[in-house]
Amino acid sequence: MNRREFLQLGLGASAFVAGCRCPFCCAGKKPIALQLWSINKVMWKEDPAKTFADIKAIGYDGVEFAGFNGLSAKQIKKLLGDAGLRGMGAHISGDKEYTGDGLKKNLDFLTEAGIESMTSAWADYNDADGWKKFGDLMGKAADIAVDWNIPISVHNHCHEFKKVYDGVYAWDLIFRDSSPRLQQQLDTSQVVNPGLDVVERLKKYPGRSFSIHMKENVPMKHGLPNDNGYFGVPPPDGGKLVDFKGTVDYLANEPGFSWYVIECERKPESLDAARFNYGFLSNLI
């Protein structure tokens, strides 16, 4: 798909920029959100209002939810508004959440809460047909969500680039024939870990990256992530670092790109890693 075809999508990713839903996009500098799973040990166990205020004080522009802890849309909107944060998005997984009444319910909730996007955080299938059907389902959901002005994305883990069918990655089975409105939310760590290049994967589907998860490479040791949570700091086993600068340089001219999302899941008990990584990334953009 070339740039002209992308721009002709109307209410595809380009429309979110044209409508300037995200004011930072029009200004040039893209905003930074924190994926709240990064602080899952404290997010809902302490005072959420104080935690949100602390996130804002670091400099973050928004947050991406990983569950709502039973709060209503109005309560979520108030938390965001009181802290001066934007609701960048929410990770919501499960096929039923992207079809029929389940999809409508989610889109209505996100709209009321002031949350800007919806992302499937996990999927796994045992054959090529399963991945293709998932891509079709998600593409149809993305087309429907246009009426709510909410982009829908799929987030990757390592297995989408480790499962290969007749020479085709599972990730590509999701995207190559699905609606061009369906967005990819690449996780930099889980692109680099299987041995791929983040920029090359972004180039594969131009104009289909509303957001990206910026996370340092997480080599595995004994089945567990083996990193220290800090961008630019080599993991204990000396694994390859993510090329954050190269990624930022490429995304500076990517049509439809709207949000950086920092994730640092190895330090969930405090905001220390979130603070360090915000400083690291903000200096690049």
Show which residues each predicted segment covers:
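Active-site acidic/histidine proton-transfer and metal-coordination neighborhood
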Residues: 95-183
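Hydrophobic faces of well-ordered beta-strands that scaffold small-molecule active sites
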Residues: 32-35, 63-65, 87-92, 118-120, ...
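Acidic-and-aromatic substrate-binding clefts and catalytic sites of carbohydrate-active enzymes
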Residues: 41-45, 64-74, 93-102, 124-132, ...
